[in-house]
Amino acid sequence: IVTREFFEQDILRSYQALAPYGITLRNAPFFMPPYEHYNATIAEWANSMGLILVNFTSGTASNADYTTPSMKNYRSSDNILQTILQKEESEGLNGHLMLFHAGTSPERTDKFYTTHLHTLILELRQRGYRFVPLTKAIR
């Protein structure tokens, strides 16, 4: 639905906005398309710009942290945490990429990143996991 020119300009504007914080294409080359929707064309455009297309690993429900109680697909933070831990118990999480949103609707009062993320990190560390930068995980 977008042209290559629009796509490239949008990416470049994003990096310009992030530059004051030291974030550059060189040190943060990862691209997760909005809503995780992409096709071969978007993948090729991203690759030609030096971007590495990534997506979260399905099955943990981590990405549901944006949902609100009024949505049919709503998942509470307790439910998300339990789903992740159950996935870890049944299959393990080595190599999994989880998506947590940095901000959510005011309608969602149990924000995973403020109420459960710390607990998840501590629990996974206790279970022997270590967290590494994405650059080390996929290269």
Predicted regions and their residues:
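Catalytic domains of cell-wall/extracellular-matrix polysaccharide-remodeling enzymes
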Residues: 1-99, 103-125, 129-130, 135-139
